[in-house]
Design a protein with these regions (language model features):
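Conserved AMP-binding/adenylate-forming
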Residues: 1-26, 170
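Conserved G/P- and acidic residue-centered "switch" motifs that form tight phosphate/ATP-binding loops
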Residues: 14, 133, 190
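Conserved adenylate-forming
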Residues: 26, 34, 39, 46, ...
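Conserved pre-ATP/AMP-binding loop-to-beta segment of ANL
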Residues: 90-129, 136, 159-166
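Conserved AMP-binding/adenylation subdomain of ANL enzymes
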Residues: 148-166, 174-215, 224-225, 229-230
Length: 236
């Protein structure tokens, strides 16, 4: 959820979100940061060392904010996570020049000055990157109008949609499909998103049935995997 929060927060204060694949190599991350002139980076603790390795090469980068999966988990699930996946993550040095996500959120509660910036439809909102199939990957600058038009068009052509409907969002948020269709189209029109942190057909089906999601957006292989699951037989 930190990605969703920061995406809208950056837009609110007049910034541009630069969406990067978290599994990118250090060289690729350095390119993305330099190409965009990013002044702040938000990443998970498990990817901290990639950013630390390139930080000195990116003059514009002033702050690195570190979030953790455990930040948003309930206490019982957090304990289980720390005993399994969490223990595999390399510890960040205590004196590392970073801002922890919880600390960052607390800093916001003490801020008393004006921070909202009025933006026009033509103003840039986000940078997404091409696949690089014909050469080096390219940053694609999209405007507020691009994203809002997408949201309105998707909902306008879907007569079944009602405010409060749920989307099971599994597509990555550094991808236009995931960020534009699964997230912004729903939230901007009064819908809700159920975030899927890590995809497996079994976990996806479980969340779909648990939350009784009204919509899903995915690629053909996702639907093929769901159709092969016994738990989806006759599911409503």
């Amino acid at each position: 959820p930190q990605t969703v929060i920061m995406f809208y927060a950056v837009n609110l204060v007049g910034g541009i979100a630069n969406m990067v694949h978290p599994l990118s190599s250090e060289k690729e991350i350095e390119f993305y940061l330099k190409e965009s002139g990013s002044i702040c980076a938000l990443t998970l603790d498990q990817f901290y060392h990639k950013f630390e390795a390139v930080r000195q090469n990116v003059e514009s980068l002033n702050n690195v904010i570190i979030a953790s999966i455990k930040d948003e988990l309930s206490k019982p699930i957090k304990v289980g996570y720390m005993l399994t996946e969490g223990r595999k993550i390399q510890k960040i040095p205590a004196d590392a020049p970073i801002i922890r996500w919880k600390e960052f959120m607390q800093m916001g509660t003490r801020y008393r000055w004006k921070y909202k910036v009025h933006k026009e439809g033509k103003d840039p909102a986000v940078i997404l990157y091409s696949g690089g199939t014909t050469g080096i990957t390219k940053g694609i600058l999209l405007s507020n109008l691009n994203f809002n038009a997408l949201g309105q068009q998707i909902i306008a052509t879907n007569l079944m949609f009602r405010p409060g409907d749920r989307m099971l969002a599994v597509m990555p948020m550094f991808h236009g499909f995931g960020l534009g269709v699964s997230i912004h189209s729903m939230l901007s029109q009064g819908g809700r998103c159920v975030l899927v942190p890590r995809f497996t057909p079994q976990s996806y089906a479980k969340l779909l049935l648990k939350h009784r999601c009204n919509f899903i957006a995915g690629v053909p292989t996702l639907y093929e995997a769901l159709l092969r699951l016994p738990t989806m037989e006759g599911a409503d």
